[in-house]
């Protein structure tokens, strides 16, 4: 399971779904959701600092729903809007074993960090790469939910790490930025090689 990861000022025309799937994580809605294209390192768009969501509208909720479906489709446990070329402060996470308990954080803000922790992280935007990243063991987070209601969350263990990972994305930061320049270059070269191979297979 990858720690997946993961904008406003976006343009709807830049959201290019690869296919449509049935909305499955809520019995309340019966609409179709799009699986979005995930950007991969070293795409410069991943370095964009996301802007706050001014108001939670149906359009924002559609983005949230598409992000959740994309996260499940990619088998990640988290996704930031930056990763799908939407530059707003939106994050979705699901660390549950059942894979049907998505958490939505709009305009998330870490209020407090406590302790030290770290695991070997991966990322949907850096496929095939993993590295140990230092993180706070516990965090207190304030955010809005899918309906625009504010809440505060106390998180520890994997959830705390995932939140920090995804919020890094909103600042244009990737987990590879914690690595040495040499390791970062090796990962970039590996991804470029994979991309060239895939293009030849088309």
From Swiss-Prot:
Q: What class of enzyme is it?
A: hydrolase
InterPro entries recorded = Peptide_deformylase, Peptide_deformylase_sf
This protein's species is Vibrio vulnificus (strain YJ016)
Task: Give the Pfam families listed for this entry.
Answer: Pep_deformylase
Q: Where is the active site?
A: 166
Q: Name one GO molecular function term.
A: peptide deformylase activity
User: What's the catalysed reaction?
Assistant: N-terminal N-formyl-L-methionyl-[peptide] + H2O = N-terminal L-methionyl-[peptide] + formate
Mind listing the GO biological process terms from this record?
co-translational protein modification; translation
Taxonomic path: Bacteria, Pseudomonadati, Pseudomonadota, Gammaproteobacteria, Vibrionales
Q: What keyword terms does UniProt attach to this protein?
A: Hydrolase, Iron, Metal-binding, Protein biosynthesis
Report the function annotation for this chain.
Answer: Removes the formyl group from the N-terminal Met of newly synthesized proteins. Requires at least a dipeptide for an efficient rate of reaction. N-terminal L-methionine is a prerequisite for activity but the enzyme has broad specificity at other positions.
Coiled coil residues, start to end: none
Which EC numbers characterise this protein's activity in its record? Answer: 3.5.1.88
UniProt signal peptide:
none
What is the protein's given name?
Peptide deformylase 2
């Amino acid at each position: 399971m990858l720690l997946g990861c993961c904008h406003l000022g976006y343009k709807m025309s830049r959201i290019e779904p690869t296919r449509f799937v049935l909305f499955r994580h809520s019995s309340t809605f019966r609409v179709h959701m799009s699986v979005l294209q995930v950007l991969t390192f070293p795409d410069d768009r991943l370095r964009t600092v996301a802007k706050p969501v001014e108001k939670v509208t149906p359009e924002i909720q559609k983005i949230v729903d598409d992000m959740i479906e994309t996260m499940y489709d990619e088998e990640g446990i988290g996704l930031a809007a930056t990763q799908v070329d939407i530059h707003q402060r939106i994050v979705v996470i699901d660390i549950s074993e059942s894979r049907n308990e998505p958490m939505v954080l709009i305009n998330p803000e870490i209020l407090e960090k406590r302790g030290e922790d770290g695991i070997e992280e991966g990322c949907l935007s850096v496929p095939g790469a993993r590295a140990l990243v230092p993180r706070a063991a516990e965090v207190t987070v304030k955010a809005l939910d899918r309906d625009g209601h504010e809440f505060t969350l106390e998180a520890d263990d994997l959830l705390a790490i995932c939140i920090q990972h995804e919020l890094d994305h909103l600042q244009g930061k990737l987990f590879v930025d914690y690595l040495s320049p040499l390791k970062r270059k090796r990962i970039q070269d590996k991804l470029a090689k994979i991309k060239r191979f895939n293009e030849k297979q088309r």
